[in-house]
């Protein structure tokens, strides 16, 4: 199939710039005939006792670092305990061996790669990289979230290749806000546990602790796996022949307990509902002859129409970009024609798209 087969017109005003007033107050589109548009807090009405929801419990880290002088880096993947790959903007302003000081901590540019990618090393005093990011980093909101407020950045003093950043913050000029205290809460699922993602597994953002409690009370099961979402999730497909596209790799983990719960539910004929494309990709990557295997691994699975699914019966997901690998995935899962029609309906109904947008519950075709 061609990349253009997965295109559709999306009005820019439907790209959600902020989360809904409450997590569960977003809209939910149920993919039945006819389509049902409801509120997410009603999701329990479309599930039944014995269903198994599988969640991604990865926690978003504050992966965005302002280096001063209008330079930012967004961490991508952990390479070792003290080294990460990252994307820099603008990368042309950075050089190998540049050093950036945050109080008594240091970030060093160790390598420059193609397409704005770099490698960095953290030299920290008595704290972990995650602790450092919690203090100095920002929530890495997607680039399509553009806001009119001013964003602050640290005052920077440069001597040679060394830049010192202090806690006196001044506003960027002509830059949109990418982080607020509200984002620190709302761009994180309520059940997140394991730090490592640089983008949210967004289907889970709609769940509240109250909804999770109600699902449990109704006999609807829940279990958790981990996929650390990388920045590559936002990379566009640039080849017209979609099968020439190279997927990014991401770290996944499924515990023996989770694998046992999923396999038991499958054997008993219970419905498996994947909460998000990250969960579905992890399940399919781990499955062999219909059996989900426990373990830690990296996946670059690219799911397109014609893929033979072995795990989930239903998929809860947000609305995705035209021509994206995730739109291709849902076309594979729930039908090419059906998803184009569903998206036309969602656009007509002014439903909100992407990370802070609305959700849809799909059945496997």
From Swiss-Prot:
Keyword terms, alphabetized: Cytoplasm, Queuosine biosynthesis, S-adenosyl-L-methionine, Transferase
Reaction(s) the record says it catalyses: 7-aminomethyl-7-carbaguanosine(34) in tRNA + S-adenosyl-L-methionine = epoxyqueuosine(34) in tRNA + adenine + L-methionine + 2 H(+)
GO molecular function: S-adenosylmethionine:tRNA ribosyltransferase-isomerase activity
Keyword Nucleotidyltransferase found: no
A single cellular component GO annotation: cytoplasm
SUPFAM superfamilies: QueA-like
Enzyme Commission number(s): 2.4.99.17
Keyword Cytoplasm among UniProt keywords: yes
GO biological process: queuosine biosynthetic process; tRNA wobble guanine modification
Pathway(s) this gene product operates in, as recorded in its UniProt entry: tRNA modification; tRNA-queuosine biosynthesis
Signal peptide: none
Purpose: Transfers and isomerizes the ribose moiety from AdoMet to the 7-aminomethyl group of 7-deazaguanine (preQ1-tRNA) to give epoxyqueuosine (oQ-tRNA).
Quaternary structure note: Monomer.
The family this protein is said to belong to: Belongs to the QueA family.
Designated name of the protein: S-adenosylmethionine:tRNA ribosyltransferase-isomerase
Organism: Rickettsia peacockii (strain Rustic)
């Amino acid at each position: 199939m061609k990349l253009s087969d997965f295109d559709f017109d999306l009005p820019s005003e439907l790209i959600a710039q902020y989360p809904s007033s409450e997590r569960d107050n977003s809209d939910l589109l149920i993919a039945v005939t006819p389509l049902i548009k409801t509120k997410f807090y009603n999701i329990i009405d479309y599930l039944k006792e014995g269903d198994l929801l599988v969640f991604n419990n990865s926690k978003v880290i504050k992966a965005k670092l302002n280096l001063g002088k209008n330079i930012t880096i967004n961490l991508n993947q952990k390479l070792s305990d003290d080294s990460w790959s990252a994307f820099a903007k603008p990368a042309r302003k950075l050089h190998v061996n540049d050093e950036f000081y945050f109080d008594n901590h240091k970030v060093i540019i160790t390598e420059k790669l193609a397409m704005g990618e770099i490698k960095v090393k953290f030299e920290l005093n008595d704290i972990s990289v995650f602790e450092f990011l919690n203090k100095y980093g920002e929530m890495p909101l997607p680039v399509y979230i553009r806001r009119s407020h001013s964003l602050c950045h640290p005052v920077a003093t440069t001597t040679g290749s060394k830049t010192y950043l202090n806690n006196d913050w001044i506003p960027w000029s002509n830059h949109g806000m990418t982080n607020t205290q509200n984002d620190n809460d709302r761009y994180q699922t309520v059940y997140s546990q394991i730090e490592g993602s640089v983008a949210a597994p967004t289907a889970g953002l709609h769940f509240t602790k109250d909804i999770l409690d109600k699902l449990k009370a109704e006999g609807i099961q829940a279990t958790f796996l981990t996929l650390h979402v990388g920045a590559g999730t936002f990379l566009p497909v640039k080849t017209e022949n979609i099968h020439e596209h190279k997927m990014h790799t991401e770290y996944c983990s499924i515990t023996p307990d989770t694998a046992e719960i999923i396999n038991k539910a499958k054997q008993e004929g219970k419905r498996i509902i994947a909460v998000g494309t990250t969960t579905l990709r992890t399940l399919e990557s781990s499955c062999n002859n219909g059996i989900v295997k426990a373990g830690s691994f990296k996946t670059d699975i690219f799911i397109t129409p014609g893929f033979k699914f072995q795990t989930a019966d239903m998929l809860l997901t947000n609305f995705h970009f035209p021509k994206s690998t995730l739109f291709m995935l849902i076309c594979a899962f729930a039908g090419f024609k059906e998803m184009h029609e569903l998206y036309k309906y969602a656009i007509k109904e002014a439903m909100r798209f992407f990370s802070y947008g609305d959700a849809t519950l799909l059945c496997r075709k």
